[in-house]
Amino acid sequence: MAATSLVGICRRASAFLKAACSLVNPKDAAHSGCRSSLSLLHKNTPHVTSFLQCKLLHTTLSRKGLEEFFDDPKNWGEEKVKSGASWTCQQLRNKSNEDLHKLWYVLLKERNMLLTLEQEAKRQRLPMPSPERLEKVVDSMDNVDKVVQEREDALRLLQTGQEKPRPGAWRRDIFGRIVWHKFKQWPIPWYLNKRYNRRRFFAMPYVDRFIRLRIEKHARIEARKRSLQKKKEKILHAKFPHLSQERKSSSV
């Protein structure tokens, strides 16, 4: 687009020079106009090539405006829209940080477009075409965030040896729960800090009974989940006995 605008400016400049030269010497107007236009094009040729090279690096359309918040007009009125699978962590680990940065903004634009489409479908009380596209985009963005966090953690472990981005320690609060306490800088020493000294990183003896009850509750919930899973497996075995036999034969 920049190259075409530059060519248009060159054409207007050549036409202006032709008109000026025709006023001075009508006979030499055509020759001087051609020479001036050729000289302008010759001077601006590297700029045109540089503009073309810059255009190849762009990934979005300029002067698109608010149209990017809406779906492609080809998909308007369609009940189903074809879409690919979401990006997995294994695929994203093979990409560079620059590619992940570009992909994040592409997914962000796609998510904004799908959210606009979802809101418009709710307003018109119509089903959204292919709502799984939004789930795939959200999963892809979560995977990109996860891969970037993995790289940051690996770099921090290499440089400082710390697992967490902010240093801290595992401590027990007054309710007997083990929590991660984040360290922070204070302008005064800890033994002079009244706010810090009001915090209790220990549990009193009467809390032990409630700790035991909490552990029993958690164990009871896990046992209930396991029994429910076994009941579901028994129902499936009774409903599809041939599959259970094939599984036993394959395991043997």
Curated annotation (Swiss-Prot):
Region (Disordered): 230-252
Residue positions where N6-acetyllysine is found in the record: 146
Keywords: Acetylation, Mitochondrion, Ribonucleoprotein, Ribosomal protein, Transit peptide
Principal location class: mitochondrion
Keyword Transit peptide: yes
Gene Ontology BP, a term: mitochondrial translation
Cited Gene3D superfamilies: 6.10.330.20
InterPro entries: MRP-L47_sf, Ribosomal_uL29_mit
Quaternary data: Component of the mitochondrial ribosome large subunit (39S) which comprises a 16S rRNA and about 50 distinct proteins.
Basic residues: bias regions: 230-240
Family: Belongs to the universal ribosomal protein uL29 family.
Name the record gives this protein: Large ribosomal subunit protein uL29m
A GO molecular-function annotation: structural constituent of ribosome
A GO CC annotation given for this chain: mitochondrial large ribosomal subunit
Organism from which the protein derives: Mus musculus
Cell compartments where the protein resides: Mitochondrion
